[in-house]
């Protein structure tokens, strides 16, 4: 017998799970809950979320309430009579009245090994912290943030060059498999959630654009990780003089033979350009830029940018 599901999600990372459940012979996705259309692009035209577009393409009814915890929407969801509701990066906290609607509760797929990195940016936080292992967790939603009992986990190695986008792409796929098996176990009454440990709790709030600004006073390994952690969103950036420049991942290797000796004392934010590389000083060793994106332009090779911009020899990144 098919389990009636309402799927709640918004960004592209939720698509593997949504598609997996739609195509499953054991589940019936009766409706999709997503955030309202949001402004996108230079013109700021409202656009449907990636999850909304997938639901529309599949002919699945869309629910896009501005206030999902309002009594009006709680009543509307009740009329759909879901047996279980599923959340993958929906983008809003759910209150007790809404959580009480489905008899089998709400199941969340979260992209960390809970209780580590509760919150909106677990993948970014894991990379920035220098973690080598992360994963995805399915758990029963409670009113408090990402604290509910756990159904299952899957682990994933963080590669030394992983950006948040790279890692999230893999977790979205492995997490979709975990979520499907979790729902099967709940339906078969063979899966019992276990409480999260009280130790090891950490939090990963959403990263703002201002927080993605590079602090060159930090040691090179920290700078390198933080840039990867905010790539592609919201994107690392710095000021070069008064010009704002977005940065792609940088390279750091304190033992690299191509690092000129004169760069060793390069001050934090100091810029050195030669015929094949652009280096910026940090609180320890310099890092080499790969790609940069000046305001209003596309990403380009850092050397081409530096030569085209005709940087002042005293120019600094800040």
UniProtKB/Swiss-Prot annotation:
Signal peptide positions (record): none
A molecular-function term among this protein's GO annotations: methionyl-tRNA formyltransferase activity
Entry EC no(s): 2.1.2.9
Annotated Pfam families: Formyl_trans_C, Formyl_trans_N
Record's catalysed reaction(s): L-methionyl-tRNA(fMet) + (6R)-10-formyltetrahydrofolate = N-formyl-L-methionyl-tRNA(fMet) + (6S)-5,6,7,8-tetrahydrofolate + H(+)
PANTHER family in the cross-refs: METHIONYL-TRNA FORMYLTRANSFERASE, METHIONYL-TRNA FORMYLTRANSFERASE, MITOCHONDRIAL
NCBIfam families with a match to the protein in the record: fmt
Name under which the protein is recorded: Methionyl-tRNA formyltransferase
Originating organism: Mycobacterium leprae (strain TN)
Highest classification ranks of the organism: Bacteria, Bacillati, Actinomycetota, Actinomycetes, Mycobacteriales
Gene name for this UniProt entry: fmt
């Amino acid at each position: 017998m098919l389990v009636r599901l309402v799927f709640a999600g918004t960004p592209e990372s939720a698509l593997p799970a949504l598609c997996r459940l739609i195509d499953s012979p054991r589940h019936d996705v009766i409706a999709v809950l997503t955030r309202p259309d949001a402004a996108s692009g230079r013109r700021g035209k409202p656009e449907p979320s990636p999850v909304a577009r997938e639901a529309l393409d599949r002919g699945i009814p869309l629910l896009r309430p501005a206030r999902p915890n309002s009594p009006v929407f709680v009543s509307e969801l009740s009329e759909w009579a879901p047996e279980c509701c599923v959340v993958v990066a929906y983008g809003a906290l759910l209150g007790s009245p809404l959580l009480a609607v489905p008899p089998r509760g709400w199941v969340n797929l979260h992209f960390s090994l809970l209780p580590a990195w509760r919150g909106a940016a677990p993948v970014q936080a894991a990379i920035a912290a220098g973690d080598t292992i992360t994963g995805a967790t399915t758990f029963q939603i409670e009113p408090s943030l990402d604290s509910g009992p756990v159904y299952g986990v899957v682990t994933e190695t963080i590669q030394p060059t992983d950006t948040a986008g790279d890692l999230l792409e893999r977790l979205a796929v492995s997490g979709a498999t975990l979520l499907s098996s979790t729902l099967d176990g709940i339906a078969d009454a063979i899966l019992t959630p276990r409480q999260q440990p009280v130790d090891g709790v950490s939090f990963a709030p959403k990263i703002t654009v201002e927080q993605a600004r590079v602090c060159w006073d930090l040691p090179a390994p920290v700078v390198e990780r933080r840039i990867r952690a905010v790539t592609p969103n919201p994107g690392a950036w710095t000021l070069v003089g008064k010009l704002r420049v977005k940065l792609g991942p940088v390279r750091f290797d304190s033992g690299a033979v191509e690092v000129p000796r004169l760069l060793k004392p390069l001050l934090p934010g100091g810029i050195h350009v030669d015929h094949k590389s652009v280096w910026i000083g940090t609180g320890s060793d310099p890092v080499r830029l790969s790609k940069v994106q000046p305001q209003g332009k596309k990403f380009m090779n850092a050397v081409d940018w530096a030569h085209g911009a005709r940087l002042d020899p005293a120019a600094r990144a800040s």
